[in-house]
Amino acid sequence: MTDLPFVTADLPGSGGALRRAPEDFRVDEVPAYLPSGAGPHLYLRVEKRGRTSRDAVRELARALGVPERDAGCAGLKDKDAVTTQWLSFPVARDPDPAALAAPGLRVLEASRHQNKLRTGHVRANRFTLAVRGGDLGRARECAGALAARGLPNFFGPQRFGAAGRNAAVGRALVTGERTPEAGRAARDRFLRRLSLSAYQSLLFNRWLAERMADGLFAAALAGDAMKKLDTGGLFTCEDPAADGPRVERFEISPAGPMFGHALRLAAGEAGAREARLLEAEGIALADFARGGGEAEGTRRAARLRVEVALEPLEDGYRAAFELPRGAYATVVMRELTKGEAELPEDAD
């Protein structure tokens, strides 16, 4: 992310080291809904340490005597952290949660619900991070600026793979370039979707970086696709003078392109900016139909509200904040520290 701008570039970062131990990084999943208490699916809220979400699903499915494929999980959490999340299992009996404990895994809560938990049934993730050796005073200045200016909703480096290889493979799939890596991805649905998503994310980051460079991060342009931050609804900006104050109040945000073959470009000046980005890449929207047609395209909010709570530690500080599904804690922490450390993120 070293080529991406900071919204707090005028402020020095706190410095410091992130994630020296799993306990330094905690992620608590905020579900889209809570289990109702009745139904055929057993819902378990689990805490894991040093275990992946797949490890937890496998362990619990075996203990409950159900096939692993029947388990439900809203999002995958990294193993190098302390995380909590809900999992679901089609089990008639109500087991003793204590009996399901395993190394690095414990059940915090059990309930029931009518439906299986599905990927994406997450409202947000709550992050708590320790920054060892960080300057609390500087962190507070950056956090205050973030609260006022908003968080650029960049994708973190985890999205792109080592040295950006996933995005490079995705571009090859879109352009039709024949490479060994693109050939493998074309035959493997998981790799294909991963690579195409990485390339879409790279182009979104470029779009947002250009917008920030032109002083349009918290502005409304004629023709902008706008997203309502409370409901996710989309509309076209027809009156920038009216929509601009709503952007500033975090009611709405420009919604940048995750380019795809079914996406419609924004209108007016905003659409012209998107078209120039595609032209610079030498691609057209229709090119995203290559590789199985799975890159249909969508819109992503450019600017988010984030409130970071800070407290001192003996050797640094602790930061706590909540982000909507799909936003990256890495982006928040690089604004606070001005470092480029990579953090585990929700991999849903």
UniProtKB/Swiss-Prot annotation:
Give, as one word, the top-level EC class: isomerase
Q: Which domain of life is it from?
A: Bacteria
Q: Which GO terms describe its biological process?
A: tRNA pseudouridine synthesis
What residue intervals traverse the membrane?
none
Tell me the keywords, alphabetical order: Isomerase, tRNA processing
CDD domains given in the database record? PseudoU_synth_EcTruD
Q: Name one GO molecular function term.
A: RNA binding
The keyword Isomerase is annotated on this UniProt entry: yes
InterPro entries assigned to the protein according to its UniProt record, in alphabetical order: PsdUridine_synth_cat_dom_sf, PsdUridine_synth_TruD, PsdUridine_synth_TruD_CS, PsdUridine_synth_TruD_insert, TruD_catalytic, TruD_insert_sf, TruD_pseudoU_synthase
Give the EC number: 5.4.99.27
TRUD domain spans which residues?
A: 150-304
**Cellular component terms, GO, for this chain's entry?**
cytosol
**So what family is this one in?**
Belongs to the pseudouridine synthase TruD family.
Function statement: Responsible for synthesis of pseudouridine from uracil-13 in transfer RNAs.
List the protein's name. tRNA pseudouridine synthase D
Organism lineage string: Bacteria, Pseudomonadati, Myxococcota, Myxococcia, Myxococcales
Q: Which gene encodes it?
A: truD
